[in-house]
Amino acid sequence: MQRGFTTRPASPPRLSLLQVPEPKTAKNRLHLDLRVSGEGTPEHKWSRVTDEVAQLSAAGAVARHTFVGHHVVMTDPEGNEFCVA
């Protein structure tokens, strides 16, 4: 059985992330923009973004470009890009 991660929001759509044995060979066909939850001032939201980036970095992701106050472009361990905002 392959390991994976599935989100289950209150309503569809669902998202499944699965490990595959093949290495990345081309540009991503899918780019995820992940949004942190919660309310508050722009400073509070940015603090939550940087906290999430720290957690993702600890799990193996790498921050590539930071647009302070807005979003961070990251890559997973296989080089696939995604953004955290």
Q: What residue spans do the PLM features occupy?
A:
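Hydrophobic alpha-helical positions that pack around
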Residues: 28
